[in-house]
Regions:
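Bacterial N-terminal signal peptides
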Residues: 7-19
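Short carbohydrate-recognition loop motifs
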Residues: 50-72
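Extracellular carbohydrate-recognition regions
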Residues: 24-45
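Solvent-exposed strand-to-loop "edge" motifs in beta-rich extracellular domains
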Residues: 90-96, 119, 174
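Extracellular beta-strand ligand-recognition surfaces/modules
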Residues: 109-114, 149-159, 163-205
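Extracellular/lumenal carbohydrate-interaction signature centered on repeated Trp-anchored short motifs
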Residues: 76-87, 160-163, 184
């Protein structure tokens, strides 16, 4: 009888371990339900984009309003993307930026973008991936930023087709980094969002849902 009980216990333990391995581990940067976490910091490049936490379409989100301005919110975090390779978020824009053009400095403005910043001991060699809602760039295209080749722009959305609706994005940061830089990624040190219109002088509005970081199941 004791042997039978031990076998049953071992069976349930193995079942629990198996089930836990089938589910991804998750980190939520900020669920936004208590306002903006103090872990978010703002960096201004020209003026200030207005960021506020609101409830829109029955979901908590960060609203961004830019008027010829460029500032971003960044969230410092230290993790290995090999352990947590997936990043997901939802976003929505009111409209694209008509003069936006990812291939020129004059058009380097985006209704919405999400940055992933990678660790470097030399700050001038810091690399970043920018997931952008582009205007003209074909969806899925990778190009260097018009100001620095250390930042790669990836057009996960492009054009006005999906403007006005929530879009859920899911990216494998490890795969994107390898495709962008031809190497394995170092640790990630920050994730940021930015809506900017300083180069074009236009206006833009966007909404960002909570950002989640996931392991693979």
């Amino acid at each position: 009888m004791r042997i039978t009980i031990n076998i049953i216990i071992l069976f349930f333990i193995s079942l629990v371990l198996l089930n836990s391995s089938l589910f991804a581990k998750e980190i939520i940067l900020d669920d936004l339900q208590n306002g903006l976490s103090p872990k978010w910091k703002e960096k201004s490049f020209k003026g200030f984009t207005l960021y506020s936490v609101i409830k829109k379409d029955d979901r908590w989100c960060i609203k961004a309003e830019s008027d010829a301005s460029a500032s971003g919110l960044y969230y410092e975090i230290d993790y290995d993307p090999v352990e947590y390779p997936i990043i997901t978020w939802s976003w929505k824009i009111d409209h694209i930026i008509p003069k936006g053009d990812a291939k020129t400095k004059q058009g380097d403005d985006y209704a919405a973008r999400v940055y992933v910043v990678f660790h470097s001991f030399l700050f001038w060699k810091t690399r970043a991936i920018n997931y952008i809602w582009a205007n003209k760039l074909p969806r899925g295209e990778f190009i260097p930023n018009s100001y620095t080749s250390n930042a790669i722009m990836i057009a996960v959305q492009s054009g006005p087709e999906n403007a006005g609706r929530w879009i859920l994005e899911r990216r494998n940061v490890v795969e994107d980094y390898k495709a962008a830089f031809g190497a394995d990624p170092p640790k990630i040190e920050a994730i940021a969002i930015m809506t900017d219109t300083d180069n074009t002088g236009e206006k833009a509005e966007a909404w960002y849902g909570p950002i989640r970081i996931l392991s693979l199941p």
